Amino acid sequence: MVARRKGERVVRKNEVENVQQRACANRRERQRTKELNDAFTLLRKLIPSMPSDKMSKIHTLRIATDYISFLDEMQKNGCKLYGHSIFDEKRGYNLQSAFNMWRGNNGYTPIAGPSQLPPLQSAHIPPPAPSSIPPHCLMPQPWYQTCPPPKQEFHELCPISTPNPNSNPNQLTPIHWQ
């Protein structure tokens, strides 16, 4: 039996506690990083981007900032870009194309650095009143989605043919699109 000194035992106990604390801290940091990455993934899905955009975290934040400025301008101008409505009779509101055009005309580029971004006019910009923003301007619009024209009824989008009384009820009636 080897005799141990009192101090030696305390050192080993402290080492075990340190290892456990480090493991807990690492676990918390991994969880925090995962939550942050999940939030960026969601943000990347919500903001429109161009295929040439490198969607790093900082670039994602820059595009999100640009998109907020764009939506604010759309709200102030009644969903008009440079005096023209962004509503298309066939495709609805195409925020993706309008945002890309706005970004290009305002000098925002995928590689813009902090020195190239326009300065803020004021430190505090109050949010617009929720009732003053048209609902169709608030909906996030990924590149593959467009809004239907306002007040267009579902039956106009999906016409239903009237059944022929002489036809077999088990037979499908073709739909004739207008």
UniProtKB/Swiss-Prot annotation:
Changing residue 29 to K: Dominant negative effect on function in transcription regulation and mesodermal cells fate specification. Delayed development. Impaired vulval and non-striated enteric muscles development. It comes from the Eukaryota. Expressed in defecation-associated muscles and neuron-like cells in the head at the L1 stage. In later larvae, expressed in SM cells and their descendants. Not expressed in differentiated body wall or sex muscles. This is Twist-related protein. Acts as a transcriptional regulator. Involved in postembryonic mesodermal cell fate specification. Activates ceh-24 and egl-15 during mesodermal patterning. InterPro entries: bHLH_dom, E-box_TF_Regulators, HLH_DNA-bd_sf, Twist-rel_bHLH. Disulfide bonds: none annotated. Residues 20-71 form the bHLH domain. Pfam families: HLH. Its main location: nucleus. Efficient DNA binding requires dimerization with another bHLH protein. Homodimer. Forms a heterodimer with hlh-2.
